From Swiss-Prot:
Keyword Coiled coil found: yes
Function, as annotated: Key component of the ribosome quality control system (RQC), a ribosome-associated complex that mediates the extraction of incompletely synthesized nascent chains from stalled ribosomes and their subsequent degradation. RqcH recruits Ala-charged tRNA, and with RqcP directs the elongation of stalled nascent chains on 50S ribosomal subunits, leading to non-templated C-terminal alanine extensions (Ala tail). The Ala tail promotes nascent chain degradation. May add between 1 and at least 8 Ala residues. Binds to stalled 50S ribosomal subunits.
Note: Repeated attempts to crystallize a full-length protein yields proteins cleaved between the N- and C-terminal domains.
Pfam families given in the database record: NFACT-R_1 (PF05670), NFACT_N (PF05833)
Quaternary structure annotation from Swiss-Prot or TrEMBL: Associates with stalled 50S ribosomal subunits, binds to RqcH. Recombinant protein interacts with the N-terminal 30 kDa of human fibronectin (FN1).
Protein name in the entry: Rqc2 homolog RqcH
Length: 552
């Protein structure tokens, strides 16, 4: 784990320099497991992100913007009651562990002095953010409640006494004595795994880097390793407070550990936050897809069962033709089938006359023929629904936080979700704008099916070129105000269509290109569904860096 005690040691120094003595002005909880504090310190405004996420747990200053819930939850309200307007008196790391404490002082509604500690524990799935009364060490509230049935050693509930996580009895590498350190370095194996067991707060990467430093002059190099000044750095798979042996040579320069984390988590945390916000929608779409796929299998089986319709008609025809050869008192008859040149055995109802038996087969044939027509229509409708839901599923997988609400609105309008009590109608956004590589042509991209419909049938002019990944879910893309785009611009548009499709990560994607005037929306068609003929097909390989560089 990159955010280990060693990294937190360096981060604590950064936070102290920027935040100690500062005043907490605003408190928000944009996501289920993350808190953002707006702090004014040294005539500057800072945003402090506290995350109790099981994978991305961390503490950092951030430049990122967040959308906050319209109605704050209980934890946010309690934090505001105790911390809004509070002064941060001290920021302290517990030894070299992944626990950070913010000691604050404030006054309550009647002017009495309040002292509290906001504790951030970064411990994987057990990560937590806990507000504690400093005088009594009682828990006021926590972002995650832990009852006795979950953890008999320490409950994390309002009113419980705060107990620190169990001690591991490992040594703090910053305060261990020279005598003890000499004994360990002289007698113990210095493998990364053993270093993690002996010394507190070392993640796997840090322990591996330390082991490399201890190949010669162990005591001197041990102290030198932990005395190094902070140099924020990316590693081959993560990040570190210092350049490690596996740090890439060419990488951006980071002014602070916080800017390093903003860079590293900008996509990873965003995708996870989208997943949190979109969880209900993803589950609903997955459920509807499963239901419709099962329905399609059943309908296709029923259609297969109607394949006897032609044989039923032939039996009626043969009974009519050879009526005089059909007995009245037998359960079957064998007649020459002039359709095949072979004899055909035909079952009879002994309670009916030969003529009535023939009519019985004709009536059965008519029912089967009507069933074929009905089932064919149902199958087409079910297939259309599956295609639509797959497109929504694709867009949910690629959506930003800002786009989730609009996809939710789409699912409400199409009847897959009900509007929540007092939920307002979400204002529809316009398709996204991208600048082609010629530096002047604007390309529009629909980011959901409502935007796709608006772009294709309301915004696109007749002669403008329209693009869509071939035969797979994806965005509608239109080159605007350029009726004769260059091949380079066409490629740009095709790459956008490929990137914003189910084939985003494919090496070669087929993309259809056609004039917008040749597009047709069938009556009753689902949002985003179009038909067309006469298209040309391009083959492109989209790259994320190019797409991001085109975004306006």
């Amino acid at each position: 784990m990159s955010f280990d005690g060693f990294f937190l040691h360096h981060m604590t120094a950064e936070l102290r320099a920027n935040l100690e003595g500062g005043r907490i002005q605003k408190i928000n909880q944009p996501f289920e497991q993350e808190i953002v504090l707006n702090i004014r310190s040294n005539r500057q405004s800072h945003k402090l992100l506290l995350s109790a996420h099981s994978v991305f747990g961390r503490v950092q200053l951030t430049q990122s913007d967040f959308t906050n819930p319209k109605v704050p939850n209980t934890f946010t309200m309690i934090l505001r009651k105790y911390l809004q307007g509070a002064i941060i008196e001290e920021i302290r790391q517990l030894d070299n562990d992944r626990i950070l404490e913010f000691s604050v002082s404030n006054k309550d509604e009647i002017g009495d002095h309040i002292q509290a500690t906001l504790i951030v524990e970064i411990m994987g799935k057990h990560s937590n953010i806990i507000l504690v009364d400093k005088s009594e060490q009682k828990i006021i509230e926590a972002i995650k409640h832990v009852g006795f049935s979950q953890n008999s050693y320490r409950t994390i509930l309002p009113g419980s006494t705060y107990i620190r996580p169990p001690e591991t009895h490992s040594l703090n590498p910053y305060t261990v004595s020279d005598e003890k350190l000499f004994e360990i370095l002289s007698t113990q194996e210095l493998s990364p795994k053993n270093l993690q067991q002996v010394f507190q707060g070392l993640g796997r990467d840090t322990a591996s880097e330390l082991a490399n430093h201890l190949q010669i002059d162990r005591l001197k190099n041990f102290r030198a390793f932990f005395d190094q000044a902070t140099q924020p750095s990316l590693t081959d798979k993560s990040y570190a407070a210092l350049p490690f042996a596996n740090s890439p040579e060419n990488q951006p320069h980071f002014e602070s550990l916080s800017s390093l984390l903003d860079f590293y988590y900008q996509d990873k945390a965003e995708r996870d936050r989208v997943a949190q916000q979109a969880n209900e929608l993803i589950k609903r779409v997955a459920s509807e897809l499963e239901k419709n796929r099962k329905k399609l299998i059943k309908q296709e089986q029923e259609l297969a069962d109607t394949e006897t319709a032609e044989l039923v008609r032939q039996k009626g025809e043969l009974l009519t033709t050879y009526l005089h050869q059909v007995p009245n008192d037998q359960s079957s008859v064998r007649l020459d089938n002039y359709y095949t040149g072979k004899e055909l055995e035909i079952e009879l109802d002994v309670a009916l006359t030969p003529s009535q038996n023939a009519q019985r087969y004709f009536k059965k044939y008519q029912k089967l023929k009507e069933a074929v027509k009905h089932l064919t229509n149902l199958i087409e409708e079910t297939k259309s629904t599956i295609v639509y839901l797959e497109s929504v599923d694709t867009m949910l997988g690629q959506a930003s936080l800002a786009e989730i609400d609009e996809i939710r609105e789409e699912l409400i309008e199409t009847g897959y979700l009900k509007r929540r009590h007092r939920e307002k109608i979400h204002k529809r956004q316009k398709p996204e704008r991208y600048l082609a590589t010629d530096g002047k042509t604007i390309i529009l991209v629909g980011k959901n099916n409502l935007q796709n419909d608006e772009l294709t049938f309301k915004m696109a002019k007749k002669g403008e070129l329209w693009f869509h990944a071939k035969d797979i879910p994806g965005s509608h893309v239109v080159i605007t105000d350029n009726l004769d785009p260059s091949d380079e611009v066409k490629t740009d548009a095709a790459e956008l269509a490929a990137y914003f499709s189910k084939a985003r990560h494919s090496n070669l994607v087929q993309v259809d290109m056609i004039e917008a005037k040749k597009l047709h929306k069938p009556t009753g068609g689902k949002p985003g569904f179009v038909t067309y003929r006469g298209q040309k097909t391009l083959r492109v390989t989209p790259t994320e860096d190019k797409i991001k560089s085109m975004k306006i």
